[in-house]
Amino acid sequence: MGKMFDALQKVQREKYVEPADEVQSSVPEDSVLDDKLVSVFASSSMITEQFRRLRTRIFRPGMENPPRIIMVASAMQGEGKSFVAVNLASIISLELHSYALLVDCDLRNPSVTRWFGLQAKKGLSDYLIGEAEIQDLLIKTPIDKLSILSGGSIQGNPVELIGSNKMKTLIQDLKS
């Protein structure tokens, strides 16, 4: 496969835990996860069920070529894109037992790492400006098979970074 797949496999091997039979038990008890991760803390709630429905609509049963990349976006701050992204990624990794990489592309206000009780000094923006290699930036979350790439350090030109050729190459690498 590609470099991205190899990097994800390496991150998973470093902290791999055998898949658990129940969703709740696949998250370590000592994790400092945000309580808004309803897909983890309220696995039988109506909200979590809506994330399951969304997941099923994206990954329809019998689909020959399921999507490799899903983007969650909004026009304004505070509309819930991080809430949707972290819960959808959690449901995918927990219930489909599929590897998932959640990339925080909000370079103005990166927040994904905080949802998982993690910190990252560098991330996507640092990769895009050439100050870090992607394999050094992937972070394993407390949720089995879910890794994240944080937004990184705040840069003055987030629109240009997201539209850069390096970002396009990263997206192509993620698809492979």
Show which residues each predicted segment covers.
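P-loop NTP-binding module
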Residues: 1-176
